[in-house]
């Protein structure tokens, strides 16, 4: 299990995310976990705390469910937009499954292409992009390119539920495979197809194969460069979010092992929805659930003794809107003290 390069030994047991706020070299922070454990609430709250310490913060949702708009009560889209009430916190929601057509189309309807009826463009597209994950990889690379040009000091990713979270790590390989396939097609059939399809080409946006190759190569370079940063613990860390239940703990352990195998730093776990029944409480369900949660909390502390483990309470209301998010975010840096 990895630990951050600049986190000092004295801070390792601190039950907060303060070490992440203090680590000024961080540029990329990923927040991930199983569905329904409070990832979006945690990533929004972390971004709010970072905005107090950094010049500019960008919060990006790559979860197709797009909960950022719901959390802040404000509509976000593909373009970065300032969050109401903040001068240095922006947010955007992107679809990681965006299609190749969206990326390459220049706004011309396919029906206007005289060759569209022959299906030549579609055939080339199907051949070139038959490798699984190419759409997603190119969409992600486009986002990274956009994010890099915007030059935010720190970027927080509210990721899709585990299973999709770590896909971006395989994208350079996926793009390399697609490039190799396209190069092969280009050398074998390129001149012939380009002449058949005419100057406008048969690919979306009227591009020919060489232009498409150049575009994919530039995207591959971007994604490879950023992936190098992802593996640098001074620049990137991953915050795991879970609840104190078996399946969530199992998923967290699997995710941490996968992150470690990719050399991605992780040293913080946020445990959400913890019950703190008052002493002498006669709520049978509350006490039974607390007992179960206590068992898994002990396992978390034993398994991840060199992690910052943050304990967050189950609240009586949904955490939605600026005020509630700010209140919740305070508990990420100041440990929650349950009422006696």
Swiss-Prot record:
ATP binds at residues 34-41, 245, 272. CDD domains: ArsA. Homodimer. Zn(2+) binds at residues 283, 286. GO terms for molecular function: ATP binding; ATP hydrolysis activity; guanyl-nucleotide exchange factor activity; identical protein binding; metal ion binding; protein folding chaperone; unfolded protein binding. Pfam families: ArsA_ATPase. NCBIfam families: GET3_arsA_TRC40. Belongs to the arsA ATPase family. It comes from Aspergillus clavatus (strain ATCC 1007 / CBS 513.65 / DSM 816 / NCTC 3887 / NRRL 1 / QM 1276 / 107). It is found in: Cytoplasm; Endoplasmic reticulum. One of its GO terms (biological process) is tail-anchored membrane protein insertion into ER membrane. Its EC number is 3.6.-.-. ATPase required for the post-translational delivery of tail-anchored (TA) proteins to the endoplasmic reticulum. Recognizes and selectively binds the transmembrane domain of TA proteins in the cytosol. This complex then targets to the endoplasmic reticulum by membrane-bound receptors, where the tail-anchored protein is released for insertion. This process is regulated by ATP binding and hydrolysis. ATP binding drives the homodimer towards the closed dimer state, facilitating recognition of newly synthesized TA membrane proteins. ATP hydrolysis is required for insertion. GO terms for cellular component: GET complex. SUPFAM superfamilies: P-loop containing nucleoside triphosphate hydrolases. This is ATPase get3. The keyword Protein biosynthesis does not apply.
């Amino acid at each position: 299990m990895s630990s951050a390069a600049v986190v000092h030994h004295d801070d390792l047991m601190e039950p907060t995310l303060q070490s992440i706020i203090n680590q000024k070299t961080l540029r990329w922070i990923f927040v991930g976990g199983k569905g329904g454990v409070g990832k979006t609430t945690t990533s929004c709250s972390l971004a709010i705390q970072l905005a107090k310490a950094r010049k500019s913060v960008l919060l990006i949702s790559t979860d197709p469910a797009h909960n950022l708009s719901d959390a802040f009560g404000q509509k976000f889209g593909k373009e970065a937009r300032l969050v109401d009430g903040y001068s240095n916190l922006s947010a955007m929601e992107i679809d990681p499954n965006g299609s190749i057509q969206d990326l390459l189309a220049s706004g011309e309807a396919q029906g206007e292409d005289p060759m569209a009826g022959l299906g030549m463009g579609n055939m080339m597209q199907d051949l070139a992009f038959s490798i699984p994950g190419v759409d997603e990889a190119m969409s992600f690379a486009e986002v990274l390119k956009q994010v890099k040009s915007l030059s935010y000091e720190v970027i927080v990713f509210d990721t899709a539920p585990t299973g999709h979270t770590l896909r971006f790590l395989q994208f350079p390989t996926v793009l390399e495979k697609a490039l190799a396939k396209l190069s092969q097609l280009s050398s074998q059939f390129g001149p012939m197809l380009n002449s058949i399809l005419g100057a406008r080409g048969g690919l979306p946006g009227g591009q020919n194969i060489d232009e498409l190759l150049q575009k994919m190569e530039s995207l591959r370079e971007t994604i490879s460069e950023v992936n190098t940063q992802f593996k640098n613990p001074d620049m990137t860390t991953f915050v795991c979010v879970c609840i104190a239940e078996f399946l969530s703990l199992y998923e967290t352990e699997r995710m941490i092992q996968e992150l470690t195998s990719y050399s991605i730093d992780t040293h913080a776990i946020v445990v959400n929805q913890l019950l703190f029944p008052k002493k002498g409480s006669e709520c049978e369900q509350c006490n039974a659930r607390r007992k179960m949660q206590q068992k898994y909390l002990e396992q978390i502390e034993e398994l991840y003794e060199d992690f910052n483990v943050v304990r967050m309470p189950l609240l009586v209301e949904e955490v939605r809107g600026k005020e509630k998010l700010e209140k919740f975010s305070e508990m990420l840096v100041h440990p929650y003290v349950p009422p006696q």
